[in-house]
Amino acid sequence: MFVHPRDPFVRVNALKSSRHVRVERDGHLLAESDSPILVFETGLPTRYYLPERDVDPSLLVDSDLQTGCPYKGFASYRDVVLSGRRYPGLFWYYQAPFREVSQVKGYLAPYNERIDLIVDGRPQDRPAGPLGPRGEPGMRAA
């Protein structure tokens, strides 16, 4: 899989946190955690990586989608099925993340643009930007 070269002006940091994170879609609770890892990457919204144990496994289905990132590694995706409707690629994860973000191994990241994210009891706006308005049209590397 081809991945674009690193940009010397992009920085990626991963920090453990105790913030309370809830992930919902269409009123359904998908995940809830008090031990996320926050990933900050230049030009992108903060990503909340949640321990796999904190994501409801009964809603997840493996996806064939894979993407690459020159800063984090190669991502695999999981779709979410709610009331018979399949939502593609709502979570991604790195089986072998690069050294800079090695602590996200065993964690899943919700696609902020396509879910409802509540952090410390406060609903977060769905970001617009490089991944599309409100994240609905199309997908790009995680």
Where are these regions (language model features)?
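Terminal leader/tail segments of proteins
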Residues: 1-142
